[in-house]
Amino acid sequence: MTQKIKCALIGPGNIGTDLLAKLKRSPFLEPVWMVGIDPESDGLRRAAEMGLKVTAEGVDGLLPHVLADGVQIAFDATSAYVHAENSRKLNALGVMMIDLTPAAIGPFCVPPVNLKELVGRKEMNVNMVTCGGQATIPMVAAISRVQKVKYGEIVATISSKSAGPGTRKNIDEFTRTTSGAIEKVGGAEKGKAIIIINPAEPPLMMRDTVHCLTEGTPDQAKITESIHAMIKEVQKYVPGYRLVNGPVFDGNRVSVFLEVEGLGDYLPKYAGNLDIMTAAAARTAEMFAEEIISGVLKLEPVVA
């Protein structure tokens, strides 16, 4: 039996609950704590039924148990507003943070684009951008590694049912964080992000549109090849990630149309936005966990 790295999840909402299902299947990670603020929360109840320790007293309810229970990685699926404080408290105990909020106090992580580099830098807080960012930035990066992208714009459409209260509270942060990551990770000179929450019934599957303006005339063959290679990389951890149409070339504009089907771990398969976020976070934590298990990475307390 391989040694597993013990994890805590903060935020028992849609994202936290979906992530828990994925961590339960991980060969390297063992979820042991679920942290919430509402004792009546469905997510806390579910986690307790799965055998996790739970607290409804927020991160402060977890802190006294971190060292005794050997927690080394924590996932924050709460809100951008509280993440900095959560991270400070846990980093001080030597716990690495995987941030699933748009707080972005640590470097952005989009696994197929820059995960290996971040593991090598021994970061103690990495930010998973947003669901729209995880779905689209690999495509921007696939184009920008072929030639310079002057402008990258993404439109993420998610079903209303898949957007919980935390996601709704963080809409402005979603836009800012995703735009920044299109530039920093995707490689576009200027980035723009738009999110649409669609109330249609039955709920629609997550759809994403990516438009990039290249500096010169797009090299169609190379860009097409690069996009298909990148899609295969994303499909390694999100099998329901699909190219619906494209790349479509129109002058200097390259457009890619995607849909993301979820595994249906917590919400039904239309909520691919949960999957792309939680699967990317689990993939990231697994890479760090492998380094910890092999002795290459030693987590040290961070003094604030």
Swiss-Prot record:
Main enzyme class: oxidoreductase
Family statement: Belongs to the acetaldehyde dehydrogenase family.
Protein name: Acetaldehyde dehydrogenase 1
Protein's GO biological process: catabolic process
SMART domains reported in the protein's UniProt record: Semialdhyde_dh (SM00859)
Catalytic function, reaction form: acetaldehyde + NAD(+) + CoA = acetyl-CoA + NADH + H(+)
Residues binding NAD(+), per UniProt: S162, A163, G164, P165, G166, T167, R168, K169, N170, N273
GO molecular function, one term: acetaldehyde dehydrogenase (acetylating) activity
TM helices/strands, residue ranges: none
EC number: 1.2.1.10
Organism: Dechloromonas aromatica (strain RCB)
Record: active site: C131 (acyl-thioester intermediate)
Keywords: Aromatic hydrocarbons catabolism, NAD, Oxidoreductase
Keyword DNA damage part of the UniProt annotation: no
